[in-house]
Amino acid sequence: RINFDIHRAFGLWLWGVLFVVAFTAFSLNLYSEVFYPVMSKISKVSPTPFDTRVPTSHDNPILPKQTYETIIAKARADAKARGFTAPVGGAFYSAHYGIYGVAFHKVGDDHGAGGVGPPYLYYDGADGRYLGERLPWKGTAADIFVQAQFPLHSGRILGVPGRILISLTGLVVAALSVTGVVIWLKKRRARVLRKKPA
């Protein structure tokens, strides 16, 4: 009886949180395959440079013709013109897309406001031209919904209390799994006993 009570209570109390975690897991894992195409049909999503290019295979990376130093210098100048106050906090190069990304944040603040991440400026790895930007909590309603997926999934959108809630939700999922199996085994045993001839 206690297994059934735990299973039912946790399932009822946390179904909303469990739904959010499940939905955001789907959106993060199947972003380019399902989530982005569906969102683009429902509402206006501003494409990033990664959404407008086809990635190369792992065997055929795009080698950059621009150096990190050159791209970071361009990004600093562009960020100053845009009124960014944070310094360059990091940079990366995606060899599958031929794109540099430069992030702007203070040390230790790489998750930005509400966990949505810092602003990024993107540049072409071949000729260094500016390709676009990603600004946290800016854009269309669909852009903001897309940006909110990781903060919702990780609980960062609510700060430390949200992260604690998501951690506890993981324990609840484990409890639901265990109690679900125990309930199933008891029902199965009862069915088997009923079928046995007297």
For every predicted segment, state its role:
Residues 1-198:
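Conserved histidines in hydrophobic membrane contexts and catalytic metal-binding motifs
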